[in-house]
Amino acid sequence: MSSLKHQLKTYHIPFDDQMLERLERYTALLLEWNRAHNLTGAKNSQEVEEHLIDSLYPLRFLPPFDSCADIGTGAGFPGLILAIALPKSHFDLIEPLKKRVAFLHYCVMELGLSNVSIHAKRIEALTLEAPDLITSRAVTSTQTLLSLARPLIAPHTSILFYKGERVLGEIQEEEGYTITPFKQRRYLFKQGV
């Protein structure tokens, strides 16, 4: 059993063979590109797998959704990874850095993902239809993210921000957020902003 498969089972993250194959291929692509382009700090498959599990863990509690906008996708965390896991949902990946955009396009092609659109822009310069879910990982403060995402938010839009332990200082309890802890991560979720 592969290390990734073992972790998916350990953390009760749903997967099938196609998802596992794509995640393993993504890991190889990221490590290959990372040597030349420094896309992320992950230097080996174990470190990439940590990012994969971090990206996928919310599948344990997220309600179903049809569309997602991921702000600051970077090398694919969490948007591209969630797109691999949820092929029936559409993902708009928003990333302004050209080398990361090139990598994302390459991954979409190599992995045969038809549910992904990549936007090589900053969120402030983008016009999109309001998605069901907005995600972001390690981009900026919660209030700044909400301000940047405001044009994309409709009454049906939920948010999932991948935050660190300091998230409690960024929000008020009465704002209706659910915080789910996992290792050093705090998943900040609010259904129907």
Swiss-Prot record:
Compartmental location: Cytoplasm
Name of the protein in question: Ribosomal RNA small subunit methyltransferase G
One example GO MF annotation: rRNA (guanine-N7-)-methyltransferase activity
Organism: Wolinella succinogenes (strain ATCC 29543 / DSM 1740 / CCUG 13145 / JCM 31913 / LMG 7466 / NCTC 11488 / FDC 602W) (Vibrio succinogenes)
NCBIfam families according to UniProt: rsmG_gidB
HAMAP family, A to Z: 16SrRNA_methyltr_G (MF_00074)
Family: Belongs to the methyltransferase superfamily. RNA methyltransferase RsmG family.
EC assignment: 2.1.1.170
Chain's role: Specifically methylates the N7 position of guanine in position 527 of 16S rRNA.
Lineage of the species this protein comes from: Bacteria, Pseudomonadati, Campylobacterota, Epsilonproteobacteria, Campylobacterales
Main location as per UniProt: cytoplasm
Superkingdom of source: Bacteria
